[in-house]
Structure formats: C-alpha cells, structure tokens
Amino acid sequence: ACFFGLIYPKLSSSIVIMSMPFSGTQLRKNKGFNIKKINKNLNALRPAKKHYQLYLSGKSANNNIMNCSQGISKFLRSYYYFKSYDFDGNKPHKLKNYSTKELKKMPEYYIMKNNLGISQTVSKYMPSKAYVKECAWLTEKDLNIFSNSFKNTSFKGPLSWYGMMLDEKEKQQILDLNLSRKIFIPALFVAGEADWGIFQKPGDLIKMEKEFFNNYYGTKIIKKAGHWVQQEKPKETFKVINSFYKKIRKSED
C-alpha cells in the first residue's frame, strides 16, 4: 500500500497500514536488517535457529504446509491461534537492535528452530477443543472455507511476497525509481496490542511515525487483539479507521 502511494500519488488520497510499520524506501540505508547475516548468526546459536522470512521465501515452505501431518485446517488453526491475542505468550515490546540476543526474544513463528518447518513449529501450539468451539473470531465454518481454498491454490501466491520482499534485484528496481522519502497523504497505522509485527524490525515504528509519514494521524493500538486485528476485533478496527476518515473529511470542509 505504501509503495502504491509513492508510485501513484495522484491515485492515492489516504492510506491505512496494519501490523508491520513501513519506514520508507531507502533500503540500502537499512543496514541493520541484513537477512542473510541475521540468519547466519541465528544458525550459530545452540540450538540453531532461523529467521522466518528467509524460510518462508524458500522453496520448501509451501510443500511443508501442503503436506503437513496435521492437515491444512489444523495447521491454520494453530497458526492463527499462535499469532493472536488469545495465546498468552504474545507480549511484544521494543527490541534494541538486530542482535541475536534481541531477536531470539521473539516467538517461534518469527525466530524458528532451524530443524523445524513452519507446520512442525506451530503444531505444538494447537489450541484445545474447548477453545476452538468458543472462538468467535475464527469459527470452524470460516476456517474450513480458508483451508479448502488453500487446498486448491496452495500457499505459493501468499508466500511469494516474502521472496519479492527479500529479492536484491527487486530492491534495486525500487531504488532506481528514485521515489519520495515521504508520503504526504493522510496516513494511519493500526495494530493489535499483542502483535509482534509492530516491533520485529527495531526502529521502524519510530522512523515511520517521525520521518516517513508527513501527514500522520497516529498509531492506533487495539486492545485484546493480536496479529489478526481486523478478525479478532472487527468493530474496534472499523471504529478507528472510520474515525480517521471522518477527521480527513472534516479537515477538507
């Protein structure tokens, strides 16, 4: 969404981004986030670990999910639960830097054990039958629609995002566009309080707030929501976004 706003500013009147901050296009200057170096350092830990983005950008991730022993439906259930507010282990906070000491503070869905695929990683966090029955924000009926869809299409499409994000040629093409360092249209950032996406890249939230958005309407953190903020708390999410657009309209009158 931010890249669209930068490339086609005349087609964008406002922007709302969710979960992961966007700190700008100066990719070469983001010296801290060197995914290969980060992953090498994580591999050197004992037990060895790996960064989820590099893993999900690889060829094995889709096969790992599609052929997982628990089945796609249970994979999705545990994955959604693991990254939600409902999982007690999600207590995100600021990280000082990209050192392994700091990064390994994040949950296993971000800093994975090196010998496990994503399906094995999340299988340990399958919620109870009682939880599944009471989970109003992701019913079994809705989950079955998702799982049946992915059975037909696989996860290659969604996973390709990681490959594009980390691809050096793609980064260079973006740099060659000489895009603006700022977005000047009204902007809002929304995330759940239990979402580690806010802090997984140290410093990005502050850079986004102070440098990238030139017409910033604020960071809205929604209580009792995790990574799936629009599913977990749809009414609250709608309320903050609707309020954002009302403020824009009022400023234009």
Question: At which residue positions do the language-model features occur?
Answer:
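Flexible "cap/lid" subdomain of the alpha/beta-hydrolase fold that forms the substrate-access gate
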Residues: 4-217
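Catalytic active-site module of serine/aspartate enzymes centered on a nucleophile-bearing elbow/loop
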Residues: 214-253
